[in-house]
C-alpha cells in the first residue's frame, strides 16, 4: 500500500478490525520509510447494479443519490444523518440481494418511501411529492388522507 505522505511502497498493518457496517475491514498501517500512520478499508467488490429509470435510460446505482434525496426531504426535520445512513444501508442491501443486475427506479423509490413512512411523515410527504410527480393538489390530498388514517391506527394501538 502506497504511503499518502511520502509515497513509499512498504507499509505494515498495525491494527485490523471489522468496521461498524460489518462488511468492511478497517486497517491501521504504518509506512516503513517515514513511520506515517494511515487508515485503509477493505471490502468485497460488489457487482455493478444498473438502475432503469422511468424513461428507459440506464445509470449506475448510486447510494449517494438516495442519501442526498432523503437529506433534501428531511431538511429542518428531526432526522439525523445516522438515521438516513442506516436507511440507505438497508435499501442498498435489499437492492443488492435481488438476483438481477438491473433494478427499476420505481422499486428503489418504493423502498425509500416505505422507510420514510416509518421514520417521519413530513419527510415522507416531501419525498413523495417529488418522487410521484403529483399532477394536482388532489393527488397530494389523497396521500395526506392515507397518512392521517395510518397515524390514527398507530395511535389506537
From Swiss-Prot:
Binds 1 zinc ion. A zinc finger (unnamed) spans 3-34. One of its GO terms (biological process) is negative regulation of DNA-templated transcription. Its cofactor is Zn(2+). Residues 1-24 are annotated as: Disordered. Keywords: ATP-binding, DNA-binding, Metal-binding, Nucleotide-binding, Repressor, Transcription, Transcription regulation, Zinc, Zinc-finger. GO terms for molecular function: ATP binding; DNA binding; zinc ion binding. Residues 49-139 form the ATP-cone domain. PROSITE patterns: ATP_CONE. It comes from the Bacteria. InterPro entries: ATP-cone_dom, NrdR-like_N, RNR_NrdR-like. Disulfide bonds: none annotated. Signal peptide: none annotated. Belongs to the NrdR family. NCBIfam families: transcriptional regulator NrdR (TIGR00244). Negatively regulates transcription of bacterial ribonucleotide reductase nrd genes and operons by binding to NrdR-boxes. HAMAP family: NrdR. This is Transcriptional repressor NrdR. It comes from Streptococcus sanguinis (strain SK36). The lineage of its organism: Bacteria, Bacillati, Bacillota, Bacilli, Lactobacillales. The gene is nrdR.
Amino acid at each position: 500500500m502506497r504511503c499518502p505522505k511520502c509515497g513509499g511502497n512498504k507499509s505494515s498493518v498495525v491494527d485490523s478490525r471489522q468496521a461498524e457496517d460489518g462488511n468492511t475491514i478497517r486497517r491501521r498501517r504504518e509506512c516503513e520509510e517515514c513511520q506515517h500512520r494511515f487508515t485503509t478499508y477493505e471490502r468485497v467488490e460488489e457487482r455493478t447494479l444498473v438502475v432503469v429509470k422511468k424513461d428507459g435510460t440506464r445509470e449506475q446505482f448510486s447510494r449517494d443519490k438516495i442519501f442526498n434525496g432523503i437529506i433534501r426531504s428531511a431538511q429542518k426535520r428531526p432526522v439525523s444523518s445516522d438515521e438516513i445512513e442506516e436507511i440507505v444501508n438497508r435499501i442498498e442491501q435489499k437492492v443488492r440481494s435481488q438476483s438481477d443486475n438491473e433494478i427499476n427506479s420505481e422499486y428503489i423509490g418504493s423502498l425509500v418511501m416505505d422507510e420514510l413512512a416509518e421514520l417521519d411523515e413530513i419527510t415522507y410527504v416531501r419525498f413523495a411529492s417529488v418522487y410521484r410527480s403529483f399532477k394536482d393538489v388532489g393527488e397530494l390530498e389523497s396521500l395526506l388522507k392515507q397518512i392521517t388514517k395510518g397515524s390514527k391506527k398507530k395511535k389506537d394501538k
